[in-house]
Amino acid sequence: MLLTTKYVDGLPLHRFEAVLSRHGIEIPRQTLARWIIQCGEHLQPLLNLMRDRLLESPVIHCDETRVQVLKDPDQDPTSQSWMWVQASGPPDRKVVLFDYTSSRAQDVPLRLLESYRGYVMTDDYAGYNALALQPGVGRLACMAHARRKFIEAQKVQPKGKTGRADIALTMINKLYGIERELKDGSDEQRFIGRQEKSLPILAQLKSWLDKTQSQVTPQSVLGKAVNYLANNWSRLERYTEAGFLPIDNNAAERAIKPFVTTRSLCTSF
């Protein structure tokens, strides 16, 4: 119950301490924190098995988010630390692992995914570049990130007028429409469907991108969206190489969302 209350329900320990107190149970939050640490120590063998299973996956989704830890002896309490998530596995046997570090450097994903061979789905953070250079590792980029950037560009267009952001979004939305059509198919059916339907749209999008990039201001909202698309193009289109590859990193973002909710309710970890 303690672990579920903190990490699933997002209830900080000082609030859980108050809940218990209202029911006549006096347990200091320091004791609750110690119990959580002890649980983690007992669960370590299970975590090791989960990591082994994760590293067997053909695709691993990766993401990271900021967290402030006041009582970390290795750093200033005002500095930022990071929570890294790795998610993978089939729907009935999903594996989601979280790792806390005080660094966002590229050696972190190298350590977390040491000896991994397969595809990694990430955002465009440069900290994953070294991992992507490892033998047998292919890097995918998140189409949802690209779409969000064009949505932001669409918001600053003159009202009632269709602009370049709309053109890009129309093509990206078509790609997602194809993914919905192929969702329940086999990997082979998905691969064939992408080759027949998605590749022509990607070719149109790339042609539009090549023509448009030189016509936009790089620091404008639209320019940033266009440059994101251009800088990550090979990683964005790579999902068409196989039917089991994802189009975006939503699996990692969904996995990390409960932690983000908990973080918003806590002053620190």
Regions found by a protein language model. Give the residues of each.
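Catalytic center-proximal scaffold of phosphoryl-transfer enzymes
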Residues: 1-269
